């Protein structure tokens, strides 16, 4: 099995992915999370596993990211500010995490030839009449002058 990087690995989805990869026999997993919206309690059950390395830090604060990632095979980039309320209350931090940190991860992974899986939010779909979405579903995306649509 491969060696994985999971940014945002202490969040709900990230921590679930960490546990699934461990169950499938991952050789090692590097979790990078600043715990701004994730929680150490989500990964507490795996922190003593010798295959886990946890770095409690903002991605943009890691100076040696290129060399840190160099021995890994695949990156799941899940780190992001989540929730409209959180984004509105932490605009600068959200921009740093959602844009600059993503850029830094992509550059480091490119420098090390590491494939990356990028994730997004359901917010990109806007609003639709039905709860079930298909590729043909018509959606409404509002103006960015309204806080609800600005992130």
What are these regions (language model features)?
Residues 1-151:
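N-terminal Rossmann-like NAD(P)+-binding domain of SDR-like oxidoreductases, especially those catalyzing
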């Amino acid at each position: 099995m491969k060696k994985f990087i999971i940014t945002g690995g202490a969040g709900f989805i990230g921590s679930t992915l960490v546990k699934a990869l461990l169950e499938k026999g991952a050789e090692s997993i590097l979790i990078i999370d600043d715990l701004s919206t994730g929680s150490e309690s989500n990964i507490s059950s795996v922190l003593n596993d010798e295959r886990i390395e946890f770095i409690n830090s903002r991605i943009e604060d890691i100076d040696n990211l290129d060399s840190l990632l160099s021995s890994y095979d695949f990156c799941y980039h899940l780190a992001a500010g989540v929730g409209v309320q959180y984004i509105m209350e932490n605009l600068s931090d959200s921009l740093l995490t959602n844009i600059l940190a993503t850029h830094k991860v992509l550059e480091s992974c490119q420098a090390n030839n590491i494939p990356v899986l990028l994730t997004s939010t359901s917010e990109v779909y806007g609003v639709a009449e039905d709860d079930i979405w298909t590729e043909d579903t018509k959606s409404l995306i509002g103006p960015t002058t309204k806080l609800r649509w600005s992130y």
